């Protein structure tokens, strides 16, 4: 499947027989069904999204190759309460130099890191392969009370090559991951590839603030991160700004934070004005009923 212009499609039917799907160009292909006799490949600008369903969160394939300038995304089945992460089972998978693999979790469940997202017979990680960890866009809260330590992301029943035992590589993070954590790494421990990350100490949003208003918005988001109502618009907004920063859209993040700060100031002004109106009404009523003290 190749496209010279931007295109996107979703397939949720049945993959019959056996075969190979090769995604390239500007095509984005969603697959919501699996077949252990199929080989998948994505390269040269293509995006392949593997996304299970509520009824079938596990997808099975024979082999997957994430090629140069290709993006492989393993995305949770949804962002609702209890929606499972997608689990991928393959005979072998190869992450080539120049590829990007995105692991997208649903944090709106009790144990988002309870099981690996990928299990394979063999895993090959070439030098220069990139990895990104993020969450569903609809997520607005993350239980981030401590460092992430030895979270199993991938597991091999056979062997892992290209990443030596004990060796680690830096991973990119975005969304709520980047709000609460920093210094994410993937490392090999025997037949597992583990995630480790430390709680973020510096204000993520400050790096994109280039005006007084955007700096005020950055401070607002940073201070509010642990006291947000998951259903609030501010929580959704924080997730979006974090993603913009990760994508390099610092000017967009700055404008968004400035708007947030301005909205907050306006809201406070409105609240003060309404409170003053109420107080003046109470004074008027008291004066009407009881008169005015002659001393005044």
Where are the language model's segments positioned?
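Outer-membrane translocation/initiation segment of Type V secreted surface proteins
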Residues: 136-296
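Secondary-structure transition/turn motif
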Residues: 2-5, 53-54, 76-78, 196-204
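Extracellular beta-strand/loop-rich repeat segments of large surface/secreted proteins
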Residues: 17, 21-25, 30, 35-39, ...
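GD-rich hexapeptide-repeat beta-solenoids
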Residues: 1-13
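Bulky hydrophobic/aromatic "packing anchor" residues in well-ordered structure
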Residues: 11, 15, 101-103, 195
């Amino acid at each position: 499947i190749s496209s010279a212009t931007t295109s996107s499609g979703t397939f949720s039917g049945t993959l019959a027989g056996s075969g190979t799907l090769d995604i390239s160009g500007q095509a984005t292909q969603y697959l919501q069904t699996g077949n252990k006799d199929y080989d998948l490949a994505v390269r040269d600008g293509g995006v392949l999204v593997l996304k299970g369903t509520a009824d079938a969160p596990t997808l099975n394939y024979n082999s997957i190759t994430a090629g140069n300038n290709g993006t492989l995304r393993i995305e949770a089945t949804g962002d609702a309460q209890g929606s499972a992460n997608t689990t991928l089972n393959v005979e072998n998978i190869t992450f080539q130099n120049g590829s990007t693999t995105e692991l997208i979790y649903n944090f709106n469940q009790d144990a988002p890191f309870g099981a690996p997202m990928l299990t394979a017979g063999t895993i090959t990680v070439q030098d220069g392969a990139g990895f990104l960890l993020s969450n569903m866009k609809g997520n607005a809260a993350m239980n981030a009370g401590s460092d992430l330590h030895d979270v199993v992301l991938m597991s091999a029943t056979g062997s892992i090559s290209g990443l030596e035992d004990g060796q680690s590589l830096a991973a990119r993070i975005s969304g709520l991951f980047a709000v609460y954590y920093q210094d994410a790494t993937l490392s090999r421990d025997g037949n597992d590839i583990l995630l480790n990350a430390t709680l973020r100490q510096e204000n993520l949003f400050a790096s994109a603030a280039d005006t007084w208003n955007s700096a005020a918005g950055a401070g607002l988001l940073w201070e509010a991160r642990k006291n947000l109502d998951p259903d609030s618009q501010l929580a959704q907004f924080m997730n979006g700004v974090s993603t913009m920063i990760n994508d390099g859209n610092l000017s967009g993040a700055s404008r968004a934070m400035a708007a947030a700060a301005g909205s907050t100031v306006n809201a406070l002004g409105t609240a003060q004005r309404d409170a003053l109106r109420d107080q003046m009404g109470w004074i008027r009523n008291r004066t009407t009923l009881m008169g005015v003290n002659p001393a005044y």
